[in-house]
Amino acid sequence: MRFSLITATLGRVEEVRCLCVSLSKQTFKDFELYIVDQNEHHELEDIVRNFEKNFIIHYIRSDVKGLSYNRNIALRMCKGEIIGFPDDDCYYEVNVLQEVNEAFSSREEVGFCAVTTRDTVTKRVCHISQKAYLYKKDVLKACISYNIFVRKNTVMFDERLGVGTYFSSGEETDYLYSFIENYRTCGFFVDRTAVYHPANNADISKVYKYSLGFAALQKKDWIMRRNYKAL
């Protein structure tokens, strides 16, 4: 199966290079990377030129700021059977795509996979699941955008949620909720590899923004999906 990996980026250069280095070392080679560049500068173009000989890169410039909006640009274009959303400041262990591919290939009933995450500095585990199979109630604890992979589908990100909007978070949880309910599917947790990402610093401004996103997510889940258990 081919992977389509989508990275919407703003304000980072060396971190994107680090991500590309990790992708160039993947043991599983059938993938493409979509970089949606929201920067006013063109520094990422050098990185694209340096790595496009190693794997397929689609470079897209966007004048609109917003994580969900720009992920949706790439979602409309991607060709792979499996979609992933690596952040512009994360990187993969060398066997991430291999392990995820094997998980999907051996479990036709699974619609999405989540991978263990570790902090880039301390290497401590941040997201893990003691359960092999994941359901909607497990998403908040086990899943975050950069550790999830989904079978190709028609669900799009809610552009009212996520970084660059008033509700600065919750977009990946909302995406998975919609995917699980629309396709009546479950997930599988892959614990034999890891994605590395800086641990979030819980400063007041971030907590406030994340709280707004979480509140919006819960309200949407209650009203639109009639999930009264969320209250």
Residue ranges and their predicted role:
Residues 95-126:
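Conserved donor NDP-sugar-binding/catalytic core segment of glycosyltransferases
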Residues 159, 186-195, 207:
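Catalytic beta-strand/loop signature of glycosyltransferases that borders the donor
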Residues 83:
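Short aromatic/hydrophobic "clamp" motif used to bind/position activated sugar donors
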Residues 1-25:
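N-proximal low-complexity "stem/linker" segments adjacent to membrane-targeting elements
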Residues 203-228:
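Catalytic core of nucleotide-sugar-dependent glycosyltransferases
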Residues 62-78:
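Glycine-rich, basic loop-to-helix element that forms the pyrophosphate-binding segment
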Residues 163-175:
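Acidic donor-binding loop at a coil-to-helix junction in glycosyltransferase catalytic cores
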Residues 20-61:
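Acidic donor-binding segment of Leloir-type glycosyltransferases
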